[in-house]
């Protein structure tokens, strides 16, 4: 089965679907017309730009080009993860970047080299899509976990400091907020795994089917992706909670609550 190629005229015709949303916003007085049009324009520009960049990277297959795109993706994901939280602390974006980079590349290596069995684990046709799915899902987990932990340290500051005064170490005093943070980070992927294939067909699976691949092969890859996302989300949740705790306590086991600030 061959894939039906969409022309630019087909894409232009698809804008009528966005215009339906614009019309509803106008007649219902929602005031979202400009936002919808701007969002549609950004969608076209961003995706076409990514498409041309990926086509070039797939053609040259040079490790430096792949690394540059990986660093860009992780940087954007790290910033987005921290910005989605109501609270932040100094160097939070840098720490999120490091956590996402180490866990993302580690899991990608395990999947591409150890499970799929690629000769070159950084094969861009595999690494870039897989890493993109990892970052897209784990940044949500980091954001939820970070918000939970920082909010708890602000709200439960007296409880934490009381435990410290009674002889608990910083790690012991923050153990429960960290557990809640990791649990919060895991909720979205667990919910997705519960309903996958029943309520919705994931993007990767749908894309492979539309591309003409065998549905069972698409399902196998999707199962691999879901398990990959579960493991990565757990690792990034624990990793971000740990580096946050290390940043907010000094060597004397004192909570530096003044470092936690509310974002605009």
Residue map of PLM features:
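Loop-to-helix transition at the N-terminal end of transmembrane alpha-helices
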Residues: 31-70
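Non-cytoplasmic
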Residues: 191-216, 220, 236
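C-terminal ends of transmembrane helices
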Residues: 22-34, 77-88
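Loop-to-helix entry region at the N-terminal start of transmembrane alpha-helices
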Residues: 10-14, 65, 87-145
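Hydrophobic alpha-helical transmembrane segments of polytopic membrane proteins
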Residues: 216-245
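Structural signature of hydrophobic alpha-helical transmembrane segments
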Residues: 4-17, 60-75
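Transmembrane alpha-helices
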Residues: 173-201
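Short cytoplasmic-facing helical segments at TM-TM junctions of multi-pass membrane proteins
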Residues: 148-184
């Amino acid at each position: 089965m061959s894939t039906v190629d969409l022309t630019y005229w087909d894409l232009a015709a698809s804008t009528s679907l966005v215009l339906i949303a614009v019309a509803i916003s106008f007649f219902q007085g929602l005031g979202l017309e400009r936002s919808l049009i701007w969002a549609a324009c950004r969608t076209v520009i961003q995706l076409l730009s990514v498409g041309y960049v990926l086509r070039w990277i797939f053609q040259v297959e040079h490790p430096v080009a792949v690394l540059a795109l990986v660093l860009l993706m992780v940087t954007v994901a790290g910033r987005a993860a921290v910005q989605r939280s109501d609270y932040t602390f100094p160097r939070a974006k840098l720490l999120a970047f490091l956590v996402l980079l180490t866990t993302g590349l580690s899991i990608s290596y395990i999947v591409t080299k150890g499970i799929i069995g690629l000769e070159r684990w950084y094969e861009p046709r595999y690494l870039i899509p897989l890493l993109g799915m990892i970052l897209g899902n784990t940044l949500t987990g980091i954001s939820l976990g970070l918000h939970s932990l920082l909010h708890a340290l602000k709200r439960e500051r007296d409880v934490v400091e009381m435990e410290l005064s009674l002889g608990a170490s910083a790690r012991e005093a923050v153990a429960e907020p960290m557990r809640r943070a990791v649990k919060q980070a895991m909720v979205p992927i667990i919910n997705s795994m519960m309903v996958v294939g029943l309520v919705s067909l994931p993007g990767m699976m749908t894309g492979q089917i539309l591309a003409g691949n065998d549905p069972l092969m698409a399902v196998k890859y999707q199962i691999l992706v879901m398990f990959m996302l579960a493991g990565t989300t757990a690792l990034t949740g624990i990793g971000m909670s740990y580096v946050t705790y290390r940043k907010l306590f000094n060597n004397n086991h004192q909570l530096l609550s003044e470092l936690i600030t509310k974002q605009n």
